[in-house]
């Protein structure tokens, strides 16, 4: 399994960045290869969703995911359910530095 961790300081409030990432319905508007998002189930702090991805001439693929999030701690965990990969998990953490600046920690694990 491959792992990548990235940390960035961003000049935006942590809560605003969290809200952008958790708004998965909007992904097709700004992620070029994401053609459609389908929300299968939404609970208080969980979402079951399918992302449809098409890259160049490759047929569209569906990635099913279980997303857990905590609005108070500003964390998001995504667990892969189905699709063309063997495994995929992501973790987001948004830390407030001050009212206008935050630190994003993004961790992704995947296996083809």
Q: What does each model-identified segment do?
A:
Residues 6-8, 37-39, 53, 63-69, ...:
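Hydrophobic/aromatic beta-strand elements that line small-molecule binding cavities or substrate pockets
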Residues 13, 42-45, 72, 97-101:
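Short strand-connecting beta-turns/loops that link adjacent beta-strands
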Residues 3-7, 46-48, 62-64, 75, ...:
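Intrinsic-disorder/low-complexity, polar/charged segments enriched in Ser/Thr/Lys/Arg/Asp/Glu/Gln
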């Amino acid at each position: 399994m491959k792992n990548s961790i990235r940390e960035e300081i961003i000049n935006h409030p942590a809560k605003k960045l969290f809200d952008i990432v958790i708004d998965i319905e909007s992904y097709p508007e700004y992620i070029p290869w994401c053609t459609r998002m389908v929300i299968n189930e939404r609970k208080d702090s969980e979402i079951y969703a399918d992302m449809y991805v098409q890259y160049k001439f490759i047929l569209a693929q569906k990635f099913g995911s279980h997303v857990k999030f905590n609005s108070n701690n500003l964390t998001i965990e995504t667990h892969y359910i189905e699709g063309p990969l063997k495994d995929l998990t992501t973790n987001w953490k948004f830390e407030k530095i001050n009212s206008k600046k935050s630190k994003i920690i993004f961790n992704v694990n995947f296996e083809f």
